[in-house]
Amino acid sequence: MLAIISPAKTLDWESAVPNFAFSQPHLTAYSEKLIKICRQLSPEQISSLMSISDKLAGLNAARFEQWQIEHNEQNSRAAIYAFKGDVYTGLEVETLSRDDIQFAQQHLRVLSGLYGVLRPLDLMQPYRLEMGTKLANEKGKDLYAFWGNIITDALQQAIEQQGDRILVNLASDEYYKSIKENQLEVKIIKPVFLDNKGGKYKVISFYAKKARGLMCRYIIQHRVTDIEQLKEFDLGGYQFNPSSSTQTEFVFKRDLTK
């Protein structure tokens, strides 16, 4: 079983990181091509392209300039400890054990606009390049065109190493679009998290993002390798709802307290 999640816009380069044997990202040759394109952009162009403030645009222009093909512990940080957002609040990686992280290294992947696919302990340098960015490149008008089959092929290879051919989609739609689903020889499960607010169950973005992180944590801590085990997920007050679920979409519901 392999789970996928999205990265976060906010980065954490301050918190302490455990002393692990970190790994190298596999697709940096492609990352370097994107960096070269981004270095040609002015801060004003970056601001317009990414819809971010002038201050953030300046910061990211500097990050593009400072990026190096060589990744080491001086200029990089393990991906799973580098992101800070709702999904990662649910994952709460800082409380996972060394054995948990080693399991995650085999069973979790972070999709990335710059790096394509990252394992939890893969080193990465600070960047901001969301998958939906319309960055023109030699292959087309955006990052979906740039990555083409590359991300799909990397995931297929990782899934085949698991032996069970199951992919758990905990990524956002923006990032999942980078995968060519019809080319994956796997069973894809998409957990959906619904909260009852005002008498109606619906997806509430903030809660759903955190729930994706909770599900990821559950998979890691319980060493989940079977589809039926996913249905036992109960963190955060969510419960599997069979009547709302299908064979590929697992619905989990929760009643919010007033």
Swiss-Prot record:
GO terms for biological process: response to hydroperoxide. It comes from the Bacteria. GO terms for cellular component: cytosol. InterPro entries: YaaA. Disulfide bonds: none annotated. Belongs to the UPF0246 family. This is UPF0246 protein HSM_1789. The lineage of its organism: Bacteria, Pseudomonadati, Pseudomonadota, Gammaproteobacteria, Pasteurellales.
